[in-house]
């Protein structure tokens, strides 16, 4: 198993699949990284040499934001939107969809589960 940017990549996977385990790297970016470093995408991670691993690591660090740095940037951007009080920041703060989706009938993921209603049973009047 190779360690790239602080993440252990599974050794039995092909390089392009294993690189997608990094936060911020999808299939397209993985192929781009391997193309620029000159490594065969179908090569297994366990077959990579130390030199190839360091090549990939250096390329990623020089050209992309991944893992913690990317997460920090995203959180900082959301916090900035909230601080300036814009509409998008307000939607983030309320936990509602930010990009104009409807909320009357959908958006359950963002809004969370429906509030449960408390059902009260009526006492039956006893006739004596």
UniProtKB/Swiss-Prot annotation:
Annotated region (Disordered), positions in chain: 97-128
Comp. bias (Basic residues): 101-128
Coiled-coil intervals: none
Entry GO terms, CC: cytosol; small ribosomal subunit
Disulfide topology: none
A Pfam family reported for this protein in Swiss-Prot or TrEMBL: Ribosomal_S13
Similarity annotation: Belongs to the universal ribosomal protein uS13 family.
Subunit-structure text: Part of the 30S ribosomal subunit. Forms a loose heterodimer with protein S19. Forms two bridges to the 50S subunit in the 70S ribosome.
Primary role: Located at the top of the head of the 30S subunit, it contacts several helices of the 16S rRNA. In the 70S ribosome it contacts the 23S rRNA (bridge B1a) and protein L5 of the 50S subunit (bridge B1b), connecting the 2 subunits; these bridges are implicated in subunit movement. Contacts the tRNAs in the A and P-sites.
Name of the protein in question: Small ribosomal subunit protein uS13
UniProt source species: Pseudothermotoga lettingae (strain ATCC BAA-301 / DSM 14385 / NBRC 107922 / TMO)
